[in-house]
Each structure stands twice: as structure tokens, then as C-alpha cells.
């Protein structure tokens, strides 16, 4: 069996692995689709040594084998990879912070003892049974592969403290930005503005329900001032993952407003602390999600309150991964969410 690994800057290698067998508390999943994530693009651009299980972490598939101690799954079950439930016994859990479970976090970043030696850019993968969730029967295979990034945005909006009627700005119309925009609307924002330089992505934001989609810089500044009577946005979601966007988010917010940091920049950001202080900006940040939020988000996709299909821009085989990552890393790609189908 072969899996595609990002092994260095601009380098994807096909590496051969033995056909997997399940651990006693694990399952083997035949992968249907695996989405390309911003983390994969960062790894490809930077060559940073991410754990092999990190790249290719947005996958869905079918259980093909299970360990002797696994009772909750059977062969043929459709499943999606997710963050494990809180363990209940680590220091964070005992302190009443199950949402900061250290064991679940280690599994999420691929550093627990049962972490696989590769991610989901493969035909199949062995994984702890605690890491998978049964797919809602209403979801297609493609929708299932997009639940994971959708839940990242879901968690961020839940943490952000948005209020009914707020003027909300979402910076960036990639998969996370478009997901955040949809959840912000579902949370009751009065006006939702997407700031995005790419014309095609702006059009997609409008299709998915944004009230406005505008270019960054002066056009965005003027629109926000116009809609807020000169005050600024109540809350700004930073989904670009570039250093310059952090201060830009604060610049768009009103005094007493909020900024939610979701995009992960791989370099330090230059900020103007005085503007943060003068505006008394409240800041939240969001990484991944809680296990129970996965079920919530999946249910809302299943009943039509969140749309994934327009964000799915293309499907490729594993042999097209290198080219796709190069395109996405260029900064000029019009692709939104590319799914890898290892069966092609």
C-alpha cells in the first residue's frame, strides 16, 4: 500500500507501507475522500517537520477491519475522522477543562501512541476507534470528508461570543472563511461581510449567503464604516492565516469590538498595540474543536443548514497531490476545497 507524504519544502513522496491491521482498540478505514487543508499547504510551503499523521487529516471512509476490543463499530460502517473525546483523567480534565483535554490534543496532532505513520492521502489507514465518528446517513461521501474543517469553523464561532444582530466581518473566503461565514449567519449576525481579494471566491461567498463580499483595503474599510455608521464591525474573524491580516482585522473593528483568530500564520505578525488598547479589543482564538461539536456540525450539514457542496471545487487522485499543493501554495489559485480520492 502507498501513501503520499509531504517530506520537505515543495516535496511530496509516495511511500510504501505494509497493509494495516487494527490495534485491539483500533479500526482500519478504507478512505473514500481526503480534503487538502491549509495545514497541508503550510507544510508544503515551509518544509516544517509536521508529524506524518497531520497532513491529510480531513478524511472519511468505510471501516474494513476492527480490533478485538472494538464494540461500537463493525465492518462496513461509514466513518469520519474526528478529535477524540475528552479522556476524563488528565490534568486538564480533572481541572474541569475537558475542552482542553491533553490526551485528545495529543491524538489530534498525531503524537499519541496509536497515531498512524501517515495521513489520509492513502488507500486505507489504521486509527484508534475513539478517533472516528459514524457518518450521518444523510451525508454523501464528499460531504462527509468536509465535516472536519466545517467543525473547526463551528467551534470558532461558538467561542467568539457573537451576538444576535452583530455586524460581522470574515477575512478570507477559503474553506475556513466560507465555513465561518455560514456559521456566523446561523448564529444570528445582522450583517455579514466577507473580505477577499479573489473575485471568484467573493462570488462564492455571496452564493453561500454573505450579504457583502468586498476587496481588502480601502473598499473594505469604507463599506464597514458605511454599514456601521462609522463605528466599525462588532466582530472580525481572521481566517486568512497571513501575518498582515491580524492588524487588519483589528483596524476593521469598532471600539469595544472583538477579533477571533482562526487563521494560522507561520510567521510573526506586526501589530500596533496602541490601537488594540484604545479600542479595548477583545480577542479569542480557536484551534480544532471538541468531540461533541463534531456531531452538532454534522447534524446541521445533514439537515441543510450548512452547505458544503459549493465549496468542493475539484476531485483528484493521489498522484495529483503534488500539483494541487503547488497550485494552492501559489496564492493565486481559484480552487476552494480539493478532495483526494485514493480510488482514482
Task: For every predicted segment, state its role.
Residues 1-3, 247-251, 291-344:
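C-terminal hydrophobic helical "lid"/dimerization subdomain
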Residues 1-60, 123, 343-344:
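Short N-terminal strand-loop motif that marks the start
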Residues 20-34, 47-94, 136-138:
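Glycine-rich beta-strand-centered segment in the early N-terminal region that forms part
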Residues 37, 82-133:
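Cysteine-cluster motifs in flexible loop/terminal segments that predominantly coordinate metals
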Residues 130, 136-218, 222:
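Mid-domain Rossmann-like dinucleotide-binding core that forms the NAD(H)/NADP(H) cofactor-binding site
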Residues 160-162, 203-282:
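Glycine-rich cofactor phosphate-binding loops and adjacent beta1-alpha1 units
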Residues 258-260, 271-311:
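Rossmann-fold dehydrogenase core element
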Amino acid at each position: 500500500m502507498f501513501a503520499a507524504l509531504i517530506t520537505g519544502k515543495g516535496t511530496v513522496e509516495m511511500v510504501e507501507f505494509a497493509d494495516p491491521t487494527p490495534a485491539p482498540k483500533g479500526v482500519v478505514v478504507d478512505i473514500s475522500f481526503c480534503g487538502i487543508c491549509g495545514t497541508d499547504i503550510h507544510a508544503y510551503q515551509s518544509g516544517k517537520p509536521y508529524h506524518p499523521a497531520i497532513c491529510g487529516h480531513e478524511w472519511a471512509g468505510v471501516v474494513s477491519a476492527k480490533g478485538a476490543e472494538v464494540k461500537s463499530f463493525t465492518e462496513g460502517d461509514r466513518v469520519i475522522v474526528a478529535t477524540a473525546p475528552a479522556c476524563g483523567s488528565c490534568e486538564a480534565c480533572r481541572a474541569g477543562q475537558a475542552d482542553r483535554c491533553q490526551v485528545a490534543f495529543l491524538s489530534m496532532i498525531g503524537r499519541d501512541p496509536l497515531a498512524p505513520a501517515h495521513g489520509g492521502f492513502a488507500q486505507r489507514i489504521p486509527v484508534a476507534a475513539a478517533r472516528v465518528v459514524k457518518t450521518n446517513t444523510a451525508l454523501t461521501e464528499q460531504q462527509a470528508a468536509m465535516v472536519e474543517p466545517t467543525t473547526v469553523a463551528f467551534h470558532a464561532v461558538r467561542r467568539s461570543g457573537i451576538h444576535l444582530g452583530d455586524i460581522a466581518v470574515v477575512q478570507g473566503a477559503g474553506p475556513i472563511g466560507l465555513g465561518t461565514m455560514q456559521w456566523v449567519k446561523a448564529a444570528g449576525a445582522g450583517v455579514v461581510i466577507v473580505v477577499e481579494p479573489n473575485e471568484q471566491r467573493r462570488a462564492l461567498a455571496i452564493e453561500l449567503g454573505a450579504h457583502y463580499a468586498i476587496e481588502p483595503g480601502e473598499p473594505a474599510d469604507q463599506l464597514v464604516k458605511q454599514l456601521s455608521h462609522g463605528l466599525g464591525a462588532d466582530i472580525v474573524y481572521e481566517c486568512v492565516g497571513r501575518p498582515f491580516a491580524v492588524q487588519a482585522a483589528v483596524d476593521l473593528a469598532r471600539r469595544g469590538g472583538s477579533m477571533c483568530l482562526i487563521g494560522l500564520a507561520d510567521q510573526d505578525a506586526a501589530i500596533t498595540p496602541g490601537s488594540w488598547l484604545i479600542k479595548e479589543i477583545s480577542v479569542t482564538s480557536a484551534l480544532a474543536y471538541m468531540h461533541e461539536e463534531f456531531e452538532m456540525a454534522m447534524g446541521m450539514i445533514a439537515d441543510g443548514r450548512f452547505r458544503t457542496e459549493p465549496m468542493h471545487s475539484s476531485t483528484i487522485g493521489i498522484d495529483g497531490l503534488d500539483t494541487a499543493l503547488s497550485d494552492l501554495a501559489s496564492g493565486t489559485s481559484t480552487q476552494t476545497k480539493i478532495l483526494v480520492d485514493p480510488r482514482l
